Structures are given as structure tokens and as C-alpha cells.
């Protein structure tokens, strides 16, 4: 076996160890939750004081539930027995009240289309909601499709931040009813900046005022700081304007956690080429180990885009593959705004350069980014 093959195998085994460790941690969390339910409903106390009886007639969760009139912990559907992560999430959703039956949702107009899902406006229990319907084809052609879906739902279900998309519930029955139900938001950062449609050089809508754009940037940084400072930290891995939604008051919601990854302190990820090339960091393109600083790179591209009002690399005729090659070699970054455009952008330009630096350790944390942006706003705009 060649050295390169051995290295790939080592990387693969390392990735598997990390994945199984995370699954074990999630299972332990779920078991602790079950123990808490048992204690709160007197089930554990009943078992402890009935040990002699248990030798002859073991009490199941169902027996004890009927004795105490407490809620039963849901059983697993045989349909999902090969996907323990999804089973655990279904149980948590039913216990915590965010499991949604597809018949409860009235699907309305399609408002978005991605490579793996359609987004519909809908109504659920009187609320306007957005329903992300994962394509059944995605599960048929992707061996890890159920895991990706389970991860997105699990990640969203744990987030409580005003600038992170709010999960209302989910239909957890892939492949036909893998639906993520969230608050309904009418536009994205991409549409706010450029209007509807594909990338183009010419503007079709006015560029929003500088102060409003800067406010949106700070909100994105705050959302990402929240995600990165969780334990374990959450790496988004696909941060871009089309994955950042906006409410009626134009406040942002960071969304689409289908590529998100949990990392412990000091831990590195190995899965390469995750995300969109235009916003992807060099180390991810090269399939090298990476950490949360890959999101900082993406943010740097977005910050530059918001300041210039131009799509990254729109001035070139390069396709995604060419852009990726030039970025990896350090030859290409989006065109920076001019320092003499009257907005005192020198400090922000320096921040952009740090964010998309080729060396991940040079890039600032989102804590630092947020403080720099707030300080700049207070000095320049107030």
C-alpha cells in the first residue's frame, strides 16, 4: 500500500473515531435525560423499592408509566432502527413537543429551491412557517443522508439566539417526509443586497445604506460567536448570504445547518470540500484538517461583499474550480473596497484581510470580530 493510501486510511479512521465519540456523547446525554424523567416522575424510586418484585416480574418503562400515570418515553420506530441518532432525536422531539405530523402542515407556495430541498411557505397551528422539504432523491443517492438530516435538526433544536433561525418543529420520517419547520422569513441577505435572480454585474436594486449594512454584519458576527462558543462548538461550514435570512425588521437569522459540525476544544475536522467554493477557506478546499476558523474566512468574504455591494469575483470570468485553485495558491481574493470612498473603511479593510488570511491561526475569533465592529460603529457612525 502506498504512503498516500496509508495517510488517507489514517485520516478516515480518525474521522470515524471522532464521529463515534460524538455519537456516544449524544447517547449519554439522552440517557441522562431519560434518568431525569424517571426521577421527576417517581419511576426510579419505584424501581429501587421494588427490587425483590423485579426478580420475578421485571417492570418495563410501560408498566411503571401506567402505575405512576407519568408520560411514557416514546418507543423507536422499526423503520429507523438502523439510524440511532434519528431515533434519539424522534424521542426528544416527542417528549419536548416539537415532533410534527405531516398532516398538521398545510403546504403553500414554493418560495425557494436548493440542490437537495424545496422551501415552501406553510401554515402550522395558525403560524406562518417555512417548510424545508428534503428531496427523497437525496436520501436514495446519499448513504449518509439520514445522518445529515438528523444533524441539521438536532443542531437547530438546541439553538436559542435572536440571530439564529428558530426551529418550530420537524417531520422526522425520511425519505418522504423529512421536513424542517422554522419561522417564516421573507428574504435572505443575498436578496436584500442584490434583489431576486442570479449573479449579475449590474445592480437592479439600490444598495442599502451603509449603517444598515454594518448593523447586519454585527448581527451575523454575534450569531457566529454564539455558535463557536458553545460546548462543543458548532462550525457552520457553509456560511454565505443565501443561508442568512432576514425578518420583517431586517434582523438576520443564520440558517441551514446541513453541513454543520460539532468540535471539542482543540479538535480538528477532516471532511474536505464542504460548503461553497466562493466562500470556502483554502484549508477546506485542500482537504486539510480545519477548525472554526474556516467560518471566519467565509465571514471575511461576506463582510467584503456587504461593504462593496458586489458578488465575490464577479469582475472575473472564473468558474468555481478556477476560483478554488487560485484561492488555494494565495493568488486570489475578492476585490476590496477603496480606502478613499468616504466611509473611513481602512479599519474594516484590515479586518477583512485578517479574516481571509491563508493561515487559519492568524484569523481572529468572532469575539474579537464583534468587539472590533462595535467599536468601529460607535466611533464612526455615532
Residue ranges and their predicted role:
Residues 168-178:
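Short beta-strand micro-motifs within the conserved protein kinase catalytic domain, predominantly
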Residues 108-115, 119:
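Protein kinase glycine-rich loop
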Residues 120-138:
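Glycine-rich ATP phosphate-binding loop
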Residues 149-154:
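Regulatory alphaC helix of protein kinase catalytic domains
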Residues 295:
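Conserved catalytic-loop aspartate of Hanks-type protein kinases
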Amino acid at each position: 500500500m502506498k504512503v498516500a493510501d496509508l495517510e488517507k486510511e489514517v485520516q478516515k479512521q480518525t474521522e470515524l473515531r471522532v464521529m463515534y465519540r460524538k455519537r456516544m456523547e449524544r447517547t449519554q446525554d439522552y440517557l441522562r435525560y431519560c434518568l431525569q424523567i424517571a426521577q421527576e416522575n417517581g419511576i426510579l424510586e419505584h424501581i429501587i423499592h421494588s427490587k425483590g418484585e423485579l426478580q420475578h416480574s421485571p417492570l418495563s418503562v410501560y408498566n411503571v408509566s401506567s402505575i405512576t400515570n407519568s408520560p411514557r418515553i416514546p418507543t423507536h420506530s422499526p423503520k429507523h432502527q438502523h439510524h440511532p441518532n434519528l431515533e434519539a432525536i424522534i424521542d426528544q422531539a416527542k417528549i419536548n413537543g416539537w415532533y410534527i405530523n405531516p398532516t398538521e402542515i398545510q403546504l403553500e407556495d414554493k418560495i425557494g429551491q436548493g440542490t437537495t430541498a424545496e422551501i415552501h411557505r406553510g401554515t402550522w397551528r395558525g403560524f406562518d412557517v417555512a417548510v424545508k422539504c428534503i428531496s427523497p432523491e437525496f436520501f436514495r443517492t446519499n448513504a449518509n443522508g439520514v445522518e445529515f438530516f438528523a444533524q441539521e435538526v438536532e443542531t437547530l433544536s438546541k439553538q436559542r439566539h435572536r440571530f439564529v433561525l428558530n426551529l418550530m418543529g420537524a417531520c422526522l420520517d425520511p425519505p418522504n417526509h423529512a421536513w424542517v419547520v422554522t419561522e417564516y422569513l421573507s428574504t435572505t441577505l443575498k436578496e436584500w443586497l442584490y434583489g431576486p435572480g442570479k449573479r449579475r454585474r449590474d445592480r437592479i436594486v439600490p444598495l442599502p445604506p451603509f449603517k444598515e449594512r454594518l448593523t447586519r454584519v454585527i448581527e451575523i458576527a454575534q450569531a457566529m460567536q454564539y455558535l463557536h462558543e458553545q460546548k462543543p462548538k458548532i462550525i457552520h461550514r457553509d456560511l454565505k448570504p443565501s443561508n442568512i435570512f432576514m425578518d420583517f425588521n431586517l434582523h438576520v437569522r443564520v440558517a441551514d445547518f446541513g453541513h454543520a459540525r460539532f468540535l471539542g476544544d482543540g479538535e480538528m475536522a477532516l471532511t474536505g470540500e464542504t460548503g461553497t467554493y466562493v466562500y470556502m477557506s483554502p484549508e477546506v478546499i485542500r482537504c486539510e484538517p480545519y477548525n472554526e476558523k474556516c467560518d471566519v474566512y467565509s465571514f471575511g468574504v461576506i463582510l467584503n461583499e456587504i461593504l462593496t455591494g458586489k458578488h465575490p469575483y464577479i469582475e472575473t470570468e472564473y468558474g468555481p474550480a478556477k476560483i478554488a485553485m487560485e484561492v488555494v495558491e494565495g493568488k486570489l481574493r475578492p476585490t476590496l473596497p477603496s480606502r478613499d470612498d468616504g466611509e473611513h473603511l481602512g479599519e474594516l479593510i484590515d479586518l477583512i484581510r485578517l479574516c481571509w488570511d491563508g493561515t487559519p491561526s492568524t484569523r481572529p475569533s468572532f469575539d474579537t470580530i464583534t468587539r472590533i465592529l462595535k467599536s468601529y460603529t460607535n466611533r464612526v457612525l455615532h
